[in-house]
Swiss-Prot record:
Signal peptide: none annotated. This is Homoserine kinase. NCBIfam families: PRK01212.1-4, thrB. Keywords: Amino-acid biosynthesis, ATP-binding, Cytoplasm, Kinase, Nucleotide-binding, Threonine biosynthesis, Transferase. It comes from Haloquadratum walsbyi (strain DSM 16790 / HBSQ001). It catalyses: L-homoserine + ATP = O-phospho-L-homoserine + ADP + H(+).
Amino acid sequence: METVRAPATSANLGSGFDVFGVALDRPADIVRVERADKTTIEVTGVGSQYIPEDPHSNVVGAVAEALDAPAQIQIDKGVRPSSGLGSSAASAAAAAVALNGLYDRGLSRTELVPIAAEGEAIVSGEAHVDNVAPALLGGFTIARNSTVTTVDTTIPLVACLPEIAVSTRDARRVVPDSITMEEAVHTVGSAATLTVGMCQSNPALVGAGMDEHVVTPARAELVTGYDTVREAALTAGATGVTVSGAGPAILAVCKAERRRAVAAAMIDAFETADVEARAYQTCVSAGATLF
């Protein structure tokens, strides 16, 4: 048997649509695998009632098929589905590491990224790596074509998750098909600023680099109370706020000593919009780990 914990992740970070991602130290999924003649899946934990156990419809089933590694697979969900915190990526990454070890495939973490992404395709319709890369490799990741660059960094974060659901497919439909040159220049500047901030573990630069005027406003429309929550977080000391992945989670960066205040402010702001929410006081962390 192999047991692996894989973390929640936040993709895009505002200016890095389909490129940037970070691993969070909490929440996380735990996946256990045992060899079998055919793949079976059992799902428990947060939102398990919404996750199919048919291997042909589950992300870990796709990973098992890609690795030619049939197994009895148990998934203990800690990352809620349709949260914007890389729920499917956490399961796919954990399964990839566990099955790679169980069958002694000898693949590196980097080589497992496209395999885990095949599982992501079941959820979003496309094999994106912006969540599975940090879930496997940890830290801050930059995905460009088939190359993934990883940066170890120490950045405090707050991930606030409201009790509403936004599907990845719906969130992709609202993304504009084209942008202006002015918007492109602004996004490139923000992305460069954020990258420098990650390399320097500088929350002020990371927060400034989250600013983006194309994808974020479109997806924010799907999150009830987004503008109010964003302003509350900034007032409480956040240096930057954006939609986490497809949403509805909202990610804030701040100094470590402001995390508690930022988390409380975001929860209170959602309450004024009649939305229940919880906040994870977290940070950029390691990727999938063997138990």
